[in-house]
């Protein structure tokens, strides 16, 4: 009886530990972006853009600006919490002089849209201003520009707009290939003409070969269309080059002239008569 009792206790303990582990895993599951608006009425375009940025979810970006006591560090993550101290913070500002952390924007108030070669990611719901912008909540605007040579780089703060009564924001920029539009390849005019020429040559050779073989009944090299012309093409090209390039006539007249029979005088037979014997 005692062995069975110990076995049951072990199994119950294992089941209890498994239940606790599952519960803890649910609790520590990372939060993700929650688009502005009701869950069932979210923009399909915004959902598609967030899915497009998924390769950046596990990356963290940091940039430090300022000097001395005015040195600030900004930590940014895409649809993930950027801080362990502030719940839901997607972009935080840390004052290096006193390590004070300020939430610039939270991922539970996300808005995103894009253009041809850029994506604008906005985190709302940050910490409230103390004395600026009507004490409204801070807002982070991250401009992701197209750069086909990097997945994500060059995260930098650009400016802080807090001189207005409302709608203030922090502006940041970053480069990523995910913001680029798909490349559409177009053939140049020369390539199109080359393809057309090659197609015509192929049709000429194949069609002429079939005609010579099936209609004319030619065999061997005679099946090639216009064989005599192509065999004599070299001579034709040479004659054309000779005609265009030569500056002197091919047949230069001789420096002497022949004498015609009509120009020869009649030889007198009497001049030799004195040589005959008397």
Swiss-Prot record:
PROSITE patterns: MRH (PS51914)
GO process annotations (BP): intracellular protein transport; lysosomal transport; protein targeting to lysosome; secretion of lysosomal enzymes
Gene3D superfamilies: Mannose-6-phosphate receptor binding domain
InterPro entries: Man-6-P_rcpt (IPR028927), Man-6-P_rcpt_cation_dep (IPR000296), Man6P_isomerase_rcpt-bd_dom_sf (IPR009011), MRH_dom (IPR044865)
Topology feature Lumenal, residues: 22-186
Principal subcellular localisation of the protein: membrane
Additional information: This receptor has optimal binding in the presence of divalent cations.
Name of protein: Cation-dependent mannose-6-phosphate receptor
Organism (species): Mus musculus
Gene that specifies this protein: M6pr
């Amino acid at each position: 009886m005692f062995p069975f009792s110990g076995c049951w206790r072990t199994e119950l303990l294992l089941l209890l530990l498994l239940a606790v582990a599952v519960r803890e895993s649910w609790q520590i599951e990372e939060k993700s972006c929650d688009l502005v608006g009701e869950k069932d009425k979210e923009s399909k375009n915004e959902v598609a853009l967030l899915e497009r940025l998924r390769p950046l979810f596990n990356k963290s970006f940091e940039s430090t600006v300022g000097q001395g006591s005015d040195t600030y560090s900004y930590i940014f993550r895409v649809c993930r919490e950027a801080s362990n101290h502030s719940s839901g913070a997607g972009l935080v500002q840390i004052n290096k002089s006193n390590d004070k952390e300020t939430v610039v924007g939270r991922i539970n108030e996300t808005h995103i849209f894009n253009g041809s070669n850029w994506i604008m990611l906005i985190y709302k719901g940050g910490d409230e201003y103390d004395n600026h912008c009507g004490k409204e909540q801070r807002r982070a605007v991250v401009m992701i520009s197209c750069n086909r040579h990097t997945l994500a780089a060059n995260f930098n703060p650009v400016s802080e707009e807090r001189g207005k009564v409302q709608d203030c924001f922090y502006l940041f920029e970053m480069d990523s290939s995910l913001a680029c539009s798909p490349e559409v390849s177009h053939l140049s005019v020369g390539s199109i003409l080359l393809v057309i020429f090659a197609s015509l040559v192929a049709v000429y050779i194949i069609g002429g070969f079939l005609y010579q073989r099936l209609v004319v009944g030619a065999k061997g090299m005679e099946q090639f269309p216009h064989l005599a012309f192509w065999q004599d093409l070299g001579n034709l090209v040479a004659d054309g080059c000779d005609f265009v390039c030569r500056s002197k006539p091919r047949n230069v007249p001789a420096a002497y002239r022949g004498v015609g029979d009509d120009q020869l005088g009649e030889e007198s037979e009497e001049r030799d008569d004195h040589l005959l014997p008397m």
